[in-house]
Curated annotation (Swiss-Prot):
ATP binds at L162, G163, E164, G165, T166, F167, G168, K169, V170, K186. Autophosphorylates on all three types of residues. Dual specificity kinase acting on both serine/threonine and tyrosine-containing substrates. Phosphorylates serine- and arginine-rich (SR) proteins of the spliceosomal complex. May be a constituent of a network of regulatory mechanisms that enable SR proteins to control RNA splicing and can cause redistribution of SR proteins from speckles to a diffuse nucleoplasmic distribution. Phosphorylates SRSF1 and SRSF3. Regulates the alternative splicing of tissue factor (F3) pre-mRNA in endothelial cells. The active site is at D283 (proton acceptor). This is Dual specificity protein kinase CLK3. Residues 103-116 have a biased composition (Basic residues). Residues 117-130 have a biased composition (Low complexity). It comes from Bos taurus (Bovine). The keyword Magnesium does not apply.
């Protein structure tokens, strides 16, 4: 049974409320995104649009976003935002509200102009000096005002706009210090809280780069960073679309099973590397997984009597480390975007690396079916959906949680005759019921997902174990290799 589409109400910008409160790490509450492409009329009961806070950095950005974070229609992004995915907001699925916070400085000086300091040597050309002497202007919310043809640091020439979000904006640049290579440059708003959060993310990216000098572990790597008149700027290699963007533009036609298998293997490989280095991503979702190259071919699906896009190269990179948390850092209570949030986070039982494993299980289901497994925005409903799909929540987790308001005599308190109750009853079924074919490789995929979706994080499969799962036996030697020629460096 195909899930029907429900709209959700946005949640508060967690990037502001959580990560900002800690000195070394932060997390955001990313909420509900509408994944079902059929229904577009407003909901009869309540708004169900998700509030993420991320902005994809895409190379073919065409339309200006009108909201804060990454996607406009139903998904809303987060600070770390989908690094290279497109931010074509007017046709997106999430709605986001512009974060109202404004420093007193920006409230009184809406359009502040500063003279750009010229760091060039005396031998620099007159044209370069003219570029450097242009005034630096911020808009009333602290975004850098920049145009095509502007230069930053006399190194980065802006050649395109990739998107804009709560955190700032992303532009496509030519890096003249590296042979005019294309980069996505993330320009943070000139606001203290965002500047500090960017420094935290830079620290994580530095650690990843230090541990992965040969870039074998499929994480987007920072090639440069600098402070430009109060705007923290981070440069990344320009990649393709994120996996949600591709899914959306393909009318939510699921990825073929071989594609799911290869992407799953790469995800497990990348996240195992992070976990072995005492780092938890905490915000895994399709928007934060990017294709290296999202070129595709159009094929005709005789079974569905329609054309569909098939990506030519399923190599991916993991992005958005704005919420990544080291084991020794403070762990905020709430992490992960709603649809990929594990039960231990909802029940406030504490979390660690298994949090990422649950998120991967949800992502694989979405790749396989084209819609989210847990289409909700509210904790109680989320837990009920988990029980309908995965079975009862273990009693020891119920006894330990402080969220006793959700339970009575060891069971969830839930009105099945309410509109939400009817929705869950009609649209949620045991996990295996979603299997498209009863063949060995499909059975193996669902076995892997079920192990990733264990309620008890202590019983959840580790990523080292997942990489040995029989589902990956069908990979080719080429798909198992992770060679890359990328070598981003400052």
């Amino acid at each position: 049974m195909h899930h029907c589409k429900r709209y959700r109400s946005p949640e508060p910008d967690p990037y502001l409320s959580y990560r900002w409160k800690r000195r070394r790490s932060y997390s955001r509450e990313h909420e509900g995104r509408l994944r079902y492409p059929s229904r577009r009329e407003p909901p009869p009961r309540r708004s169900r649009s998700r509030s993420h806070d991320r902005l994809p950095y895409q190379r073919r950005y065409r339309e200006h976003r009108d909201s804060d974070t990454y996607r406009c229609e139903d998904r809303s992004p987060s600070f770390g935002e989908d690094y290279y995915g497109s931010s074509r907001c007017h046709h997106r699925r999430r709605s986001r509200e512009r974060e109202p916070y404004r420093t007193r400085k920006h409230a009184h000086h809406c359009h502040k102009r500063r003279t750009r300091s010229c760091s060039s040597a005396s031998s620099r050309s007159q044209q370069s000096s003219k570029r450097s002497s242009r005034s630096v202007e911020d808009d009333k919310e602290g975004h850098l005002v920049c145009r095509i043809g502007d230069w930053l640091q006399e190194r980065y020439e802006i050649v395109g706009n990739l998107g804009e979000g709560t955190f700032g904006k992303v532009v496509e640049c030519l890096d003249h210090a590296r042979g005019k290579s294309q980069v996505a440059l993330k320009i943070i708003r000139n606001v203290g809280k965002y500047r500090e959060a960017a420094r935290l993310e830079i620290n994580v990216l530095k650690k990843i780069k230090e541990k992965d000098k040969e870039n074998k572990f499929l994480c987007v790597l920072m090639s440069d960073w600098f402070n430009f008149h109060g705007h923290m700027c981070i440069a990344f290699e320009l990649l393709g679309k994120n996996t949600f963007e591709f899914l959306k533009e393909n009318n939510f036609q699921p990825y073929p099973l071989p594609h799911v298998r290869h992407m799953a293997y790469q995800l497990c490989h990348a996240l195992r590397f992070l976990h072995e280095n005492q780092l938890t991503h905490t915000d895994l979702k399709p928007e934060n997984i990017l294709f290296v190259n999202s070129e595709f071919e159009t094929l005709y699906n005789e079974h569905k009597s329609c054309e569909e896009k098939s990506v030519k190269n399923t190599s991916i990179r993991v992005a958005d480390f704005g919420s990544a948390t080291f084991d020794h850092e403070h762990h905020t209570t709430i992490v992960a975007t709603r649809h990929y949030r594990p039960p231990e986070v909802i029940l406030e039982l504490g979390w660690a690396q298994p949090c990422d494993v649950w998120s991967i299980g949800c992502i694989l289901f979405e790749y396989y079916r084209g819609f989210t497994l847990f289409q909700t925005h509210e904790n109680r409903e989320h837990l009920v959906m988990m029980e309908k799909i995965l079975g009862p929540i273990p009693s020891h987790m119920i006894h330990r949680t402080r969220k006793q308001k959700y339970f009575y005599k060891g069971g969830l308190v839930w009105d099945e005759n309410s509109s939400d109750g009817r929705y869950v009853k009609e649209n949620c079924k045991p996990l295996k019921s979603y299997m498209l074919q009863d063949t060995l490789e499909h059975v193996q995929l669902f076995d892997l997902m079920r192990r990733m979706l264990e309620f008890d994080p202590a019983q959840r499969i580790t990523l080292a174990e997942a990489l040995l799962h029989p589902f990956f036996a069908g990979l080719t030697p080429e798909e198992r290799s992770f060679h890359t020629s990328r070598n981003p460096s400052r």
